[in-house]
Amino acid sequence: MKFNKHKNLEGLHAPFSASKSHWLRYDDERAMEVYNNMQAKVRGTKLHEWAKMTIDLGLKQPRTKQTLHAYVNDAIGFHMDTEVVLFYSKYFFGTADTICYRNNILRIHDLKTGKHEASMEQLLVYVALFCLEYNIKFADLKDCELRIYQNDGVVEHHPTVEEIVPIIDKIIHLDKLLTANEED
């Protein structure tokens, strides 16, 4: 038999694929919820790609209350780098949407396109990874500013030593544990 070629689908995964067949037990409402969530993730990815390109090109946006415009304009204004991987080990790394470290001030900003309220925890981990990778003591920073841009609002947080040091300690501990386990 000569099978049909679907070149446009190679490397893609169907929203309701055979390998993730739990959808067989979905009612109509759940199926639509799952599909809409998948579409929102695709949209979020495209918005992140657009924001990165816009920031990298330095294309300021109109001053509006739209989250995306504020995120882009702030990143350009602070001369932030986009999509920076912060690496401690093969077990612990992550990609910060935008980041800058200048004059002993660390800024990490994150764009969230979902409807559910985002947690600052992810950005706290980025701070810990930054400190570990660049061998900077958090207590020595003049300031650390974290921002989440979501739903036409901005949440800003200035973490404390008491928040960051336990995360650093946990990363170091778990990395040693995982490395030792791998060597056995």
Give the role of each language-model region.
Residues K176-D184:
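Accessory terminal regions of nucleic-acid processing enzymes
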Residues L12, S19, C144, Y149, ...:
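Low-complexity, intrinsically disordered/propeptide-like segments
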Residues M1-T95:
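Metal-dependent nuclease catalytic cores that hydrolyze phosphodiester bonds in DNA/RNA
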Residues V84-L177:
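Mg2+/Mn2+-dependent nuclease catalytic core
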